[in-house]
Each structure stands twice: as structure tokens, then as C-alpha cells.
């Protein structure tokens, strides 16, 4: 059989190489996080599509701006981190609380069995980023927000923040494995799911990632779902249910961006 | 210039020197920290015992967010090793985690030598012999162990 003969060629590397070329094309054309754009800019993408045009009109009653993130599979984590830190810049008390929680998170992950040697590297960078967006006083807010934007567009920092949030998510799934097992489809164990769908970079996020991360950090997130679903309203969902949202995201099939409520 | 990848590789190297796992070793090449040479000693109580298998590890600036490319330089007869030395191992592909370091990579490859996965073969002959004719499999492995002394 021909397939047996082909087996010995190194297909994995060819596939990986092809993937990398596609990724490079995306990264050359879109920033990791864009500037604030008027929400109405979405219309252009769905020109002539009635359902979407109507839903965007409804959405623009509640939200003025959108901030795009690069569609690289890390968009949920990057959007979440950016949006939450941006909120913390305006709320010093919450910022200080989060800093303590973030500082303590490393020991918790080590206890859960993550290798402390490599964890340290990500944690240090994560804390660096948090310290760089320290809200000094309200007059300086704009300056700190610019700093946040700069940091999140530096690949090294930006990606390490994503890695660390992925590890926190993975840790939460492990800690409450009995609960999260219910969300997993198929024969995946929590262990397999964490290693295949959570920890590797560029793997897209699902509800289970969002719930685990929000719960671990105690942060409410509202996601607006812009899709072809019924009605002319965009459906919103809060994670964890009943929480007060601090982070607002828009989901279009396969991708998350940041929203700014009126 | 120090980049996150280079900084991390320096840390990996330091850890590998200070706390070396049994049966593996590795170090950056003289003039390029992005390319490493490594050696895995065949695990005891396996047909690979006594072999010294050389590998190269090539990192990109995206390490540790993306796995490096790891390749045997020595000839290795194994169900999950391609003819060109490439390795079919999930943690080097879709199960890569940024928490793995060089030490973890090398020890994982070492255990792959002891426990092949014949269901995702990179060398169909080796996979078939491993499943159906263990004696012949071990003979072929031992031949590459002897070869590894000379390489």
C-alpha cells in the first residue's frame, strides 16, 4: 500500500512548517492588540448581511468601542488580560487585591504539581507586567494605559501573560476536576484536556476555559455572542453566572475581541 | 540581544548542569544558543541499553511558546523515529506545554525509547516488528546500539 511507504517521510514537520507560514501571514498583518475602534467598524465586515447588520446596530446601543486582538488562538486570554488590567488601572483597590492574588498564585500552582523551575519564568514576567501598569493616580491613567498597550504588543511579554493565564486555567481544572469533568465531551480525561487544549499556546478557548479562569481569578466576564442565531438581539452570557462583569468581550465564531460599554 | 527565548534557554542550560537527569545530557553549540547538541543513553533493561544516541535540538525565538525541533543524529531503529531522525512524540507537537524545558524534553524522549507507541508509527517496519516479531525488533535495535558507539 502506498500509504505505508509514505509513512516514513517526516510529515509532522511539513505540517508544522505549513502552519507556521500561515501564522506568520496573520502576525505580519494584524497587531496583537489594536487601538480602540468605533463598534460600527464591524459593519464593513458584514456588508449586506441583514442578520449581522441588525445585530450590530442593537449592539452599538450598548457598546461604543471595540478593540481587536490577533486571531491566533490566544485571543480570549489576551483580550481578557488586557481588558481586566485596563479596568484595574482605574481601580486602585481592586488592583492591589489582584496583585496579592497574582503573587500568591505561583505557590498554589507549584502545590498543584506544576514544575516550579519553568513556572517561575512565566510568573516573574506576569508580575512585571502587573507592576508596569500600577495605577499611580488618576491623572496618570492615560499614561499607564499607553504603557499597557505597549506591553501587550511586545510579543515576549504579551505571550508570557497568555501562558501564565493558561497555566492558572489548567490549575483550576485540575483542582476542581470532578466539577469540570462534566463539561468535557468525549472520552477526554481532565488531564488529557489540560495538556491538549489548555496549556499549549494557540489552542482556542471554549466555555470551560473561560469559567475556570474567571473562577480562579474571581473576575466577572460578559461575552456578547454575535452569530447567526435567532432574533435580532445579540445574546450575552456572564461568567461565572450572576457575577458583575468587569471584562466585556464580543465573540464571533472562533474569535474574541474586547468591548467598551457606554 | 537578550530575548525571552534566549533568556529561557540560558536558564534551561543552567538547570541541566545543576540538576542533570540520569542518562541524558545536553548543551548549546559553541556559537549559537539556539542550537543544542544532546546525548541520550539507552535506558537499562531495554534493547537500547548501552547505546549513546546523539541528537540536535533547534529552537526558534518562539520558544518556549512553541516546541523546538528535535532530531536524532545517530541512527535509531524505533517505531516513532523517522528515517531522517525526526521524532514522533505528542509533547513535541500538539501536546507541547511551555512549562517543559530541555530537561523534560530529553527525559520524555528517553522514556519513548523504553515505551514505543506502535500505533502512531514513524517507521512502519520498526512498528510492525515491535508488534509481531519482538526478537527481530531487538536484533535491529541492538545493531543501531553498536552503530552508536562508532558515530
UniProtKB/Swiss-Prot annotation, chain B:
Record's keyword annotation contains GTP-binding: no
Pathway info: Protein modification; protein ubiquitination
Domain annotation UBC core: ranges: 4-150
The keyword Transferase appears for this protein: yes
Superkingdom of the source species: Eukaryota
GO biological process terms, semicolon-separated: centrosome cycle; centrosome separation; DNA repair; endocytic recycling; heart development; negative regulation of apoptotic process; negative regulation of DNA damage response, signal transduction by p53 class mediator; negative regulation of ERK1 and ERK2 cascade
UniProt cross-references to SUPFAM superfamilies, sorted A to Z: UBC-like
EC number of the protein: 2.3.2.23
One Gene Ontology cellular component: nucleus
InterPro entries on file: Ub_conjugating_enzyme, UBQ-conjugat_E2_core, UBQ-conjugating_AS, UBQ-conjugating_enzyme/RWD
Principal EC category: transferase
GO molecular function terms listed in the Swiss-Prot or TrEMBL record: ATP binding; p53 binding; protein domain specific binding; ubiquitin conjugating enzyme activity; ubiquitin-protein transferase activity
Disulfide bonds listed in the record: none
Annotated SMART domains: UBCc (SM00212)
Subcellular localization(s) per the UniProt record: Nucleus
Disruption phenotype: Lethality during the second instar-early third instar larval stages. Mutants show defective synaptic function as a consequence of mitochondrial failure.
Entry keywords, A to Z: ATP-binding, DNA damage, DNA repair, Nucleotide-binding, Nucleus, Transferase, Ubl conjugation pathway
Pfam family, one: UQ_con
Enzymatic reactions: S-ubiquitinyl-[E1 ubiquitin-activating enzyme]-L-cysteine + [E2 ubiquitin-conjugating enzyme]-L-cysteine = [E1 ubiquitin-activating enzyme]-L-cysteine + S-ubiquitinyl-[E2 ubiquitin-conjugating enzyme]-L-cysteine
Function, as annotated: E2 ubiquitin-conjugating enzyme that accepts ubiquitin from the ubiquitin-activating enzyme E1 and transfers it to a E3 ubiquitin-protein ligase. Required for postreplication repair of UV-damaged DNA. Involved in the negative regulation of the Ras/MAPK signaling pathway in the wing by acting with the putative E3 ligases poe, Kcmf1 and Ufd4 to mediate the ubiquitination and proteasomal degradation of rl/MAPK. Required for in mitophagy.
Family statement: Belongs to the ubiquitin-conjugating enzyme family.
Name the UniProt record assigns to this protein: Ubiquitin-conjugating enzyme E2-17 kDa
Amino acid at each position: 500500500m502506498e500509504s505505508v511507504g509514505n509513512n516514513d517521510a517526516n510529515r509532522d514537520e511539513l505540517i508544522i512548517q505549513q502552519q507556521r507560514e500561515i501564522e506568520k501571514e496573520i502576525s505580519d498583518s494584524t497587531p496583537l492588540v489594536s487601538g480602540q475602534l468605533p463598534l460600527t467598524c464591524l459593519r464593513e465586515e458584514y456588508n449586506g448581511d441583514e442578520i449581522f447588520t441588525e445585530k450590530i446596530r442593537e449592539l452599538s446601543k450598548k457598546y461604543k468601542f471595540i478593540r481587536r486582538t490577533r486571531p491566533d488562538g490566544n485571543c480570549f486570554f489576551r483580550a481578557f488580560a488586557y481588558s481586566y488590567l485596563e479596568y484595574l488601572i482605574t481601580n486602585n483597590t481592586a488592583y492591589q487585591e489582584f496583585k496579592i492574588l497574582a503573587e500568591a498564585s505561583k505557590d498554589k500552582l507549584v502545590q498543584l504539581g506544576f514544575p516550579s523551575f519553568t513556572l517561575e519564568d512565566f510568573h516573574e514576567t506576569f508580575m512585571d507586567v502587573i507592576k508596569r501598569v500600577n495605577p499611580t493616580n488618576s491623572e496618570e491613567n492615560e499614561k499607564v494605559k499607553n504603557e499597557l498597550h505597549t506591553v501587550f504588543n511586545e510579543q515576549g511579554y504579551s505571550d508570557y501573560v497568555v501562558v501564565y493565564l493558561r497555566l492558572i486555567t489548567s490549575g483550576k481544572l485540575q483542582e476542581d476536576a470532578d466539577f469540570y469533568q462534566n463539561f468535557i465531551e468525549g472520552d477526554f480525561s481532565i488531564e488529557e484536556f489540560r495538556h491538549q487544549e489548555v496549556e499549549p499556546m494557540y489552542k482556542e478557548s471554549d466555555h470551560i476555559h473561560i469559567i475556570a479562569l474567571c473562577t480562579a481569578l474571581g473576575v466577572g466576564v460578559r461575552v456578547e455572542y454575535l452569530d447567526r442565531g435567532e432574533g435580532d438581539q445579540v445574546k450575552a452570557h456572564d461568567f461565572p453566572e450572576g457575577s458583575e462583569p468587569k471584562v466585556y468581550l464580543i465573540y464571533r465564531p472562533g474569535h474574541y475581541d474586547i468591548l467598551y460599554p457606554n | 540581544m537578550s530575548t525571552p527565548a534566549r533568556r529561557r534557554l540560558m536558564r534551561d542550560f543552567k538547570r541541566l548542569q545543576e540538576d542533570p537527569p540520569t542518562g541524558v545530557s545536553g548543551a548549546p553549540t559553541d556559537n549559537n544558543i539556539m542550537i543544542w547538541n544532546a546525548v541520550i543513553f539507552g535506558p537499562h533493561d531495554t534493547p537500547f541499553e548501552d547505546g549513546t544516541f546523539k541528537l540536535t535540538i533547534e529552537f526558534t525565538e518562539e520558544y518556549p511558546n512553541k516546541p523546538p525541533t528535535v532530531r536524532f543524529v545517530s541512527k535509531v531503529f524505533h517505531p516513532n523515529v523517522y528515517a531522517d531522525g525526526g521524532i514522533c512524540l505528542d509533547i513535541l507537537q500538539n501536546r507541547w506545554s511551555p512549562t517543559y524545558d530541555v530537561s523534560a524534553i530529553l527525559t520524555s524522549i528517553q522514556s519513548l525509547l523504553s515505551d514505543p507507541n506502535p500505533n502512531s508509527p514513524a517507521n512502519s517496519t520498526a512498528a510492525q516488528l515491535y508488534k509481531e516479531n519482538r526478537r527481530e525488533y531487538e536484533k535491529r535495535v541492538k545493531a543501531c546500539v553498536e552503530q552508536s558507539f562508532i558515530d
